[in-house]
Curated annotation (Swiss-Prot):
Homodimer. It catalyses: D-glyceraldehyde 3-phosphate = dihydroxyacetone phosphate. GO terms for cellular component: cytosol. This is Triosephosphate isomerase. InterPro entries: Aldolase_TIM (IPR013785), TIM_sf (IPR035990), TrioseP_Isoase_bac/euk (IPR022896), Triosephosphate_isomerase (IPR000652), Triosephosphate_isomerase_AS (IPR020861). Disulfide bonds: none annotated. Keywords: Cytoplasm, Gluconeogenesis, Glycolysis, Isomerase. The keyword Cytoplasm applies. GO terms for molecular function: triose-phosphate isomerase activity. Its EC number is 5.3.1.1. It comes from Bifidobacterium adolescentis (strain ATCC 15703 / DSM 20083 / NCTC 11814 / E194a). Pathway: Carbohydrate biosynthesis; gluconeogenesis; Carbohydrate degradation; glycolysis; D-glyceraldehyde 3-phosphate from glycerone phosphate: step 1/1. GO terms for biological process: gluconeogenesis; glyceraldehyde-3-phosphate biosynthetic process; glycerol catabolic process; glycolytic process.
Length: 264
């Protein structure tokens, strides 16, 4: 964790929780964090619900003046019109969202989304005043070939190379090795650090050291309270994008607490 970067713990709920379950989870998480006197100024917490729960999460957060932030899991590259099923960045921003996940491996695989589309998503999110969380990471096959760092860095470079310095500085990168997502397998702290450092170096080479040292780089892939401390202790890991553990409110509370304590 870098000395000038505020850690971020983001929970990606994927296709889980209806709007009532989402509301209850937000209230319970806020209660848990209040009970331990959580300092949101030193560690940001964000939840990424499904589109159908965004409004409910907004109401829960705003009605109780909670410090928890939230965002969307996907976004359209178009602003409006005859695009059935799409949701624009402006629509998401009007619900008070701070972040939007772009380029997640599940979106790349099942929809599919390519780098050109992801570049447009990043620009749409930035234009709407939110921060994109750009997901990158290698498959097991790429790791077996020993090209995992080149692959992850290449994904970042292909998406960011045409951004301005100002746009790039607002980016958040989530390194999520595909083989670790939902498998119980987790990258070693050194592997996570190596990837984060390589990504940061590429950003510094492209946009200058100021931008490279400003961008927060998260780790994702079977994060739990058992491995959070050793991961966040790495100098270039600035937080987490969490899947399964973010569906369990007590476990997510523990990860938030450990992240804050370790980076204090």
């Amino acid at each position: 964790m870098g000395p000038k970067r505020i850690p971020l713990v983001a929970g990606n709920w994927k296709m889980n929780f209806d709007h009532l379950e989402a509301t209850y989870f937000v209230q319970q998480l806020a209660w848990n964090l209040r009970a331990i006197h959580f300092d949101y100024k030193r560690c940001e917490i964000a939840l990424m619900p499904s589109f159908t729960s965004l409004r409910s999460v907004q109401v829960a957060v705003e009605s109780d003046n909670l410090k928890i932030r939230y965002g969307a899991q996907a976004v359209s590259v178009t602003s409006q019109g005859a695009f059935t099923g799409d949701v624009s960045a402006d629509m998401i921003a009007h619900l008070g969202c701070s972040y939007v996940i772009v380029g997640h491996s599940e979106r790349r695989k099942y929809h599919p989304e390519d780098d050109a589309n992801i570049v447009d998503q990043v620009r749409a999110v930035l234009a709407a005043g939110m921060q994109p969380i750009l997901c990158v990471g290698e498959s097991y096959e790429e790791r077996r070939k020993g090209i995992e760092l080149d692959f992850a860095v290449g994904q970042v470079h292909d998406v960011t190379r045409d951004l301005s310095d100002e746009e790039a500085a607002k980016l958040i990168v989530a390194y999520e090795p595909v083989w670790a997502i939902g498998t119980g397998m987790v990258a070693t702290p050194q592997s996570a650090q190596d990837a984060a450092r390589a990504i940061r170096n590429d950003l510094s080479d492209t946009f200058g050291t100021r931008v490279g040292e400003t961008v927060r780089i998260l780790y994702g892939g079977s994060v739990s309270s058992k491995n959070a401390v050793e991961l966040i202790n790495e100098p270039d890991v600035d937080g987490f994008l969490i899947g399964g553990s973010a569906l369990k409110v007590d476990e997510l509370t523990r990860i938030c607490k450990l992240t804050l304590e370790t980076t204090a």
